[in-house]
C-alpha cells in the first residue's frame, strides 16, 4: 500500500507539473518555472510567520503571491532595466531564494520548515503523514489529497482557458488584437505554477518539481507536432516516469526523487536521439536514405 501511495502522489504531481510545463516550454519560459519554484520560498516562510501555522491554504496563498511578484520583477528588469531575459531571471530567483533561506534560518528555525525539506523533499515519507478526521478515521496520506486537488485545479484552469492559452502562446499579436490581455494570462499561468510548486514542496522538493516542469513536456515536444498530442504524451510520460522512478529506486535502494529524475532524463535522451521526426539519429538516417534514393534515381536515369 505504501508503494501505491508514493507512486500515486508522484504521478499526480508529475501530471500537474507536466500540464503547466507544456505551456512554459512552448512559450520558451522553462527557466521561469525554475525561477518561480525557487522564488516562492519567501512567500512560504512569510505565510508561516504571519499565520503561525503550516496550513496548506496559507502556504498556497503566499506562494501564489510571490510567484506573481517574481513574474512582475522579471518583466520589470527585462523591459525597464533592459536586461536580457535570462539575466533578469537569474537575478530575481537567486535573490528571492536567498532571502527565503535567510528567513528560514533566522525566524523559522524552530519548526520543521528547513532548506533540506524545501530543496529535496522526501516522497518516501508520504504514507506517514496521514489525514485523520476528528472522529479518528484515517483517510490516507494528506499529500495525496493535496496533489489531487491541485491537479483538478490545473485541469480546470487549462480546460476553461484553453483557447486563451493557445492564442497567447502561439500568436500573441493576434491574441492582443482580439482584446486578450497577454499580461493577465501570463500572470494566471505563473500563479498556477506557483500553486503547483508549493503544493509539491513538502513531498518532492523544489529540485524534482523543476525536473517535472521541464523534462516530460520537453520530451513530449520532441515526439509530437500538435498541442493536444503534446499534452497527452506529457501525461503518459508523467505516469511512466513516476512508476519507473519508484521501481528503479526500490531496485537500487536509493532516492526515489533522484530515480524519477534519472528516468525523466533517460526518456528525454531517447527522444532526443530517436524521436520519429525530430530525433538526431532518425534525421541523419532519413537524410542518408533520401540521399541514397536520389543517387539511385540518378544512376538508373543514366
Where are each of the predicted segments found?
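Transmembrane helix-bundle core of multi-pass membrane transporters
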Residues: 97-157
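Residue-level recognition of pore/gate-forming positions within transmembrane alpha-helices
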Residues: 14, 38-41, 63, 67-68, ...
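Short loop segments and helix-boundary regions at transmembrane helix junctions
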Residues: 23-37, 41-113, 221-232, 249-252
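Cytosolic-side transmembrane-helix boundaries in multi-pass membrane proteins
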Residues: 257-302
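Structural signal for membrane-spanning alpha-helices in multi-pass inner-membrane proteins
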Residues: 21, 45-49, 70, 74-75, ...
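Membrane-interfacial amphipathic/re-entrant helices at transmembrane-helix boundaries
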Residues: 1-16
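Transmembrane alpha-helical segments in multi-pass inner-membrane proteins
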Residues: 196-258
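Helix-loop-helix "hairpin" substructures at the membrane interface of multi-pass membrane proteins
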Residues: 138-216
Amino acid at each position: 500500500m505504501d508503494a501505491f501511495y508514493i507512486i500515486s502522489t508522484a504521478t499526480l504531481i508529475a501530471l500537474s507539473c507536466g500540464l503547466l510545463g507544456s505551456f512554459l516550454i512552448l512559450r520558451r519560459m522553462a527557466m521561469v518555472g525554475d525561477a518561480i519554484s525557487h522564488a516562492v520560498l519567501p512567500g512560504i516562510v512569510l505565510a508561516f510567520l504571519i499565520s503561525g501555522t503550516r496550513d496548506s491554504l496559507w502556504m498556497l496563498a503566499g506562494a501564489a503571491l510571490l510567484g506573481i511578484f517574481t513574474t512582475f520583477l522579471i518583466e520589470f528588469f527585462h523591459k525597464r532595466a533592459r536586461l536580457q531575459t535570462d539575466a533578469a531571471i537569474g537575478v530575481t530567483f537567486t535573490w528571492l531564494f536567498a532571502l527565503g533561506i535567510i528567513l528560514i534560518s533566522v525566524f523559522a528555525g524552530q519548526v520543521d520548515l528547513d532548506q533540506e525539506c524545501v530543496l529535496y523533499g522526501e516522497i518516501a515519507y508520504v504514507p506517514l503523514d496521514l489525514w485523520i478526521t476528528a472522529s479518528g478515521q484515517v483517510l490516507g496520506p494528506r499529500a495525496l489529497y493535496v496533489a489531487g486537488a491541485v491537479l483538478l485545479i490545473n485541469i480546470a484552469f487549462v480546460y476553461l482557458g484553453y483557447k486563451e492559452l493557445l492564442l497567447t502562446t502561439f500568436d500573441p499579436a493576434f491574441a492582443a488584437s482580439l482584446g486578450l490581455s497577454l499580461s493577465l494570462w501570463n500572470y494566471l499561468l505563473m500563479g498556477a505554477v506557483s500553486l503547483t510548486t508549493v503544493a509539491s514542496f513538502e513531498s518532492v522538493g523544489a529540485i524534482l518539481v523543476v525536473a517535472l516542469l521541464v523534462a516530460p513536456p520537453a520530451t513530449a515536444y520532441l515526439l509530437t507536432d500538435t498541442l493536444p498530442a503534446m499534452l497527452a504524451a506529457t501525461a503518459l510520460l508523467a505516469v511512466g516516469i513516476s512508476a519507473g522512478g519508484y521501481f528503479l529506486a526500490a531496485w537500487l535502494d536509493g532516492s526515489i526523487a533522484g530515480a524519477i529524475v534519472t528516468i525523466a532524463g533517460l526518456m528525454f535522451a531517447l527522444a532526443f536521439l530517436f524521436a520519429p521526426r525530430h530525433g538526431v539519429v532518425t534525421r541523419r538516417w532519413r537524410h542518408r536514405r533520401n540521399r541514397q534514393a536520389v543517387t539511385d534515381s540518378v544512376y538508373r536515369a543514366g
